[in-house]
């Protein structure tokens, strides 16, 4: 007898920024009675990733059909989020987004645990709103170093943890990264140039958080924020080729993934990581700077 269970696969592509759980088949049987074939986009001159028209990557029940829409039935092309437990026994990481709530800024993050994610989401929402409002009144630039120190110090004092957290704040003119290990942020520009804004490092007591500010340019295409479950097995170049094809090219119709190009990109990256044997939780956030809500 088939029984459904809710596994920690979270896909998001709504304007409201809320995460939604999707129902997936239990690992004891396959989706729809068989392994779901995932056809990856063909990438020229890249034999590692490229697939022929008849090639499929089988990703059984670990990845399920994803067709998520927001409350108004619209999809958001600005960002896509996917979290997969993968081959781990538990989901130890969590993602958080704050979209369309703060004038000119959206917030995306990957954290060690749901409690830390929720804390940062609430605290950053308040701190960024306050800083943006104060700076607008004074006509000066935001003090992101103050925001970062306030948030991390409150996290240690309130949540009682020094674990990893990586936050990307996307504004109209800048991208701000607050990093305390655990995930990697890469900004991709025209012709596949990859600019790492944050490297993965295992946080230890005494290691300071890192602040990076990148002034946005017209050649900036998209950002991928992901944990080592992706980066351990998928290269920067493979990531660029796949996401570029999803956002700006054409994918074969699959009937499973939502209309959001950003969500398609995040899902395919997660599926590729699983197909390549990733052993960690996989969290992927794809931010399309060309169609971002704050662009």
Swiss-Prot record:
Q: MF terms per GO, please?
A: metal ion binding; phosphoprotein phosphatase activity; protein serine/threonine phosphatase activity; pseudophosphatase activity
Residues binding Mn(2+) 1, per UniProt: 112-113
Report which reactions are catalysed by this protein.
O-phospho-L-seryl-[protein] + H2O = L-seryl-[protein] + phosphate; O-phospho-L-threonyl-[protein] + H2O = L-threonyl-[protein] + phosphate
Known EC number(s)?
3.1.3.16
Q: What are the binding positions for Mn(2+) 2 in this chain?
A: 112, 228, 280
Keywords carried by this UniProt record: Hydrolase, Magnesium, Manganese, Metal-binding, Protein phosphatase
Q: Which Pfam families match?
A: PP2C (PF00481)
Q: What class of enzyme is it?
A: hydrolase
Tell me how the cofactor is bound.
Binds 2 magnesium or manganese ions per subunit.
Organism whose genome encodes this protein: Arabidopsis thaliana (Mouse-ear cress)
Is this entry keyworded Metal-binding? Answer: yes
GO BP terms: namely: positive regulation of seed dormancy process; seed dormancy process
Q: Which cofactor does it need?
A: Mg(2+); Mn(2+)
Query: Which segments constitute the PPM-type phosphatase domain?
Result: 78-289
State what protein this is by name: Probable protein phosphatase 2C 54
Mention any one GO cellular component term assigned to this protein in its UniProt record: nucleus
Q: Give the similarity note.
A: Belongs to the PP2C family.
Task: Give the superkingdom in one word.
Answer: Eukaryota
State the CDD domains in the record: PP2Cc
